[in-house]
Amino acid sequence: MTDYEAETRAFLQDSHNRLWTASKSNYIQIFAPDGSLVGYLSKQGNITKEKQAFFNGVYSILEDKEGNIWLGTKDIGLFQLKSTGVSPKIGVNQKARENHYSIHHFEHQPNDPYSLSSNSIYTIFQDSRNNIWVGCYGGGLNLLTQTKDGKTSFIHSNNELRNYPIAYGMKVRNITEAPGGVILVGTTNGLLTFSNNFERLEEIKFYRNIRRPGDKNSLNANDIMHIYTDKNKTTYVISFTGGVNKVISPNLLSENIQFKNYDKNDGLASDLALSMIEDAQNQLWVVSEIALSKFNPVKETFENYELSSIYQERCV
């Protein structure tokens, strides 16, 4: 396998504890809980042992609460996978695993105002009210809606999501939810927040937070790469060139959210931060282009591990 084939763009642990990975070379692999390869997802919706490429550039994967798999691509829209069959049991005392899906493809249609606002999808998220939000890199925020007869529509700034600040929120990288039903949208031009407790889409109020020069408690940078809430319900905003921004305000429905910033001056390996995840010991790992940084949120200290050293150790 080449480095190009191995580079992972998106991954998902599904409700059967299988791992889905989408590579830069357009392969989607599914692994069993024991780490063995179940197979590759084909364009026909089969999981097969034969190495087959899926469609172009999958950048995001979501399993919704009904068990459907959603795949967002860089330039050809959104795919919905619905299970239609099961395979023989995998491993000892394992439930039967799904091995075939029907595929539904959604794209931007210039003549349909309720189609996707853009075919470039970087993030898909289902919130606590079961709303599925789709973040487009070039089309802003979309709310996916489905009728009982199966018709799918997308609500965005070109139809009913009229208050969405498309001038600032055109390019969405990440969507998540903080405690209290606050949806956070990371864009290339700041952080957007709103409440998912709404009755009419036209009435949603959006709040925008950006870097304010001279204000040490504003965002360090506006290009938001990732947003993460840890087990202690503390939310962190990861910004490219701005490191880690910890939310210290109790109210996120505000245009004056206060942050505590951590960057190279505080021990972070690089300000070019990309994402964050928490481990079983409640340590937070920050991924950058050159290193992994382990952050102790109690002591507020970093331990850094250069990626080149990690790769060398794996090769020994």
Question: Locations of the language-model features?
Answer:
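Carboxylate-rich, polar loop motifs that coordinate divalent cations or form catalytic acidic clusters
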Residues: 1-316
